[in-house]
Design a protein with these regions (language model features):
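ATP-binding N-terminal substructure of ATP-dependent carboxylate-amine bond-forming enzymes
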Residues: 1-114, 145, 330-331, 348, ...
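Active-site "cap" helix and flanking loop/linker of ATP-utilizing ligase/carboxylase catalytic domains
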Residues: 6-7, 260-283, 288, 298-354
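A conserved helix-loop-beta module that forms one wall/lid of the active-site cleft
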Residues: 104-170, 188, 192-195
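Peripheral (often C-terminal) accessory segments that flank ATP-dependent C-N-forming ligase machineries
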Residues: 130, 323-436
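Conserved ATP-binding module of the ATP-grasp superfamily
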Residues: 134-136, 157-160, 177-212, 243, ...
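Short beta-strand-to-turn element immediately C-terminal to the catalytic PLP-Schiff-base lysine
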Residues: 141, 171-176, 221-223, 287
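Short, well-ordered beta-strand elements within core beta-sheets of diverse protein domains
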Residues: 172, 209, 251-254, 311, ...
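Phosphate-binding site of ATP-dependent enzymes
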Residues: 184-237, 257-264, 281, 285-293, ...
């Protein structure tokens, strides 16, 4: 199929996302979204087959959407679909391609320089440092020796992470007794072969100071470099080496002055990166509970169903507002949340699943909107080291952030995953906690 076969494509998506297509199905007419994806990913993920059920899909075309160094010639060689009005990244690895296509076609977008910064945590650290945005001490890591030296200089603790991955993949919190050589090997080999093309830019790594404090994210709609909508999400993470999220709550219950500080910090980051149009998902640690320090920032919509929580709390559709903005129009924006919403991820013992019970009971609890369990009998529950490995989640609402969070936690506690061979130290389903 060629682009000329889908002249009615309104939206071009750089990188295939089933979740995003599902959301667009409720917003756009049939045959209005063209997906561009790496040929390798199309084949491995069977994208043509899996995307066929989405009414909004106009077609799937092979394109080098993950060749960030070649983004400009890729965009120059891609015929512009008739009627296209917006380009969006479907996945983290499509952020640069989306910006390049928007620039080539004269459409609002992130801006290619900003997209490149946001796809590289090392470049983001440089940009934040130049703008005096508070952040942890850090350095590029080329091997285990760099990590060991940094840890020794920072009190025996550090964070090791890839500079250009997603979903907490390869991120490790290291203490004084952790084996640096083994940790480096785990981070350097972490990959997503069904999501990331083999020719994509090589991995780079950084080591950072470990900061303590509550962790939040700020979701921001940006128009002409100016933030027009802010949301603050509270997050909790699992304890241990791998800081994978256990839950999110919208809106975060914070003092007004802390919210103001986050707004100011995010505005400074927008200016520092030169971001033009679209949505940003910035993560921050509140040092001493009040002072925002930058963790990282993505030039795309948030994952973990945070967009759903924002829609439930604020009303309307964050995605629809982003599309309106990317078409050069001004979206109607909510002034304040009308309720709260929360997501809580399941935890489970490690081993072969014998049974899953309690899902119906969880779904019947007042305020619970969604229960999804990703494991079943005879399946396997492994240790959670990244976001893809979590065994399920619950979404709930409430009049307040506390009420929504407590409802989600009760629902998770009602679900039991029984395994045949527990791994020593594993937690029972529904009992995991921990906060950044």
């Amino acid at each position: 199929m060629s682009v000329m076969n889908v002249p009615d494509a309104r939206v071009v998506m750089a990188g295939y996302s089933a979740g995003l297509l599902s959301d667009l199905d409720g917003l756009l007419p049939p045959r209005s979204v063209l997906v561009l994806e790496e040929p390798e990913i199309i084949r491995v993920r069977r994208v043509h087959e899996r995307a066929a059920d989405f009414a909004c899909l106009a077609g799937v075309l092979p394109a080098a959407t993950q060749d960030e160094d070649g983004a400009v010639p890729m965009a120059a060689g891609m015929p512009r679909p008739e009627g296209v009005r917006a380009v969006i990244p479907g996945v983290e690895y499509g952020v640069v391609a989306a910006a390049a296509l928007a620039a080539e076609w004269g459409l609002p977008g992130a801006g290619l320089p900003a997209a490149r910064i946001l796809r590289d945590k090392l470049a983001l650290r440089d940009a934040a440092a130049a703008a005096d945005i508070p952040q942890p001490a850090w350095r590029t890591a080329y091997g285990a020796g760099d990590v060991a030296a940094f840890r020794a200089a920072h009190g025996g603790a550090c964070v090791l992470k890839p500079a250009n991955r997603q979903a907490s993949l390869g991120v490790q919190l290291l203490g004084p007794d952790d084996d640096i050589g083994a940790a480096w090997a785990r981070t350097a080999t972490a990959d997503e072969p069904t999501l990331r093309a083999a020719h994509a830019i090589p991995g780079r790594y950084l080591v950072e100071q470990r900061l303590t404090g509550p962790e939040v994210s700020v979701e921001t709609l940006v128009r002409e470099g100016v933030p027009v909508f802010f949301n603050i999400t509270a997050k909790s993470v699992q304890p241990g080496r791998h800081p994978v999220e256990l839950g999110h709550v919208v809106p975060a219950d914070l003092p007004p002055q802390t919210g103001d500080a986050l707004h100011a910090a995010m505005s400074s980051l927008i200016k520092a990166t030169g971001f033009e149009y679209g949505i940003l998902h910035g993560e921050w640690i509140l040092v001493d509970g009040v002072s925002p320090h930058l963790v990282e920032c993505a030039g795309r919509g948030p994952g973990d169903s945070i967009d759903t929580l924002i829609d439930l709390a604020h009303g309307g559709s964050l995605l629809e507002r982003m599309l309106t903005l990317l078409q050069g129009e001004t979206p109607a924006l909510p002034q304040a949340p009308v309720r709260a919403a929360a997501i809580r991820f399941l935890t489970a013992p490690h081993g072969r699943v014998r049974d899953v019970t309690g899902t119906e009971r969880a779904a019947e609890l007042p305020g619970v909107l969604e229960v999804r369990v990703a494991v079943a009998k005879d399946g396997n529950v492994a240790a959670v080291t990244n976001s893809w490995e979590r065994p399920g989640h619950v979404v709930a609402t409430g009049a307040t952030a506390q009420e929504a969070a407590e409802t989600a936690e009760r629902a998770v506690a009602a679900i039991a995953v029984t395994v045949a061979d527990d791994v020593q130290g594993a937690t029972d389903a529904g009992t995991g906690d921990g906060a950044e």
